[in-house]
């Protein structure tokens, strides 16, 4: 008896490793239904935009959850390269953060540290939403 290998949690990493292009959309309207339709359309990723529109964390959580059961990877764009802005979306189940204004190496290192756990980063464990969303 053989067991099927589970699909990767974040399939974007696999697609990028293979050098394949990915396609997605940026959601600026707080609509669960729109995200469900887009996630089922065959796109690879959706970025929930917390920087340029009226989407709050509650709406972002619902929009992230709306990708469940699809291969679409939910990500969130935050308003600034500040670690505290990246924490909640990651804890809510986002599989990536789109950071604005990365202008140099220090900016990039700060962004990476904010989404990685120690010893490689500064992110703390938020056990409330993401584990239930992703079954971990």
What are these regions (language model features)?
Residues 34-62:
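Glycine-rich, proline-tolerant flexible connector loops at the mouths of alpha/beta enzymes
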Residues 1-26, 136:
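N-terminal amphipathic alpha-helix/helix-capping segment at the start of soluble metabolic enzymes
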């Amino acid at each position: 008896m053989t067991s099927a290998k589970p699909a990767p949690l974040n399939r974007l990493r696999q697609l990028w490793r293979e050098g394949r292009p990915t396609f997605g959309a940026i959601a600026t309207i707080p609509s669960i239904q729109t995200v469900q339709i887009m996630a089922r359309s065959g796109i690879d990723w959706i970025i929930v935009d917390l920087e340029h529109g009226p989407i709050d964390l509650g709406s972002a959580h619902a929009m992230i959850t709306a990708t469940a059961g699809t291969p679409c990877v939910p990500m969130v764009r935050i308003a600034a390269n500040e670690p505290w802005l990246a924490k909640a979306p990651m804890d809510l189940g986002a599989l990536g953060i789109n950071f604005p204004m990365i202008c140099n190496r220090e900016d990039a290192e700060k962004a990476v540290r904010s989404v990685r756990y120690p010893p490689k980063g500064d992110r703390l464990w938020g056990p409330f939403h993401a584990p239930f969303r992703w079954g971990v």
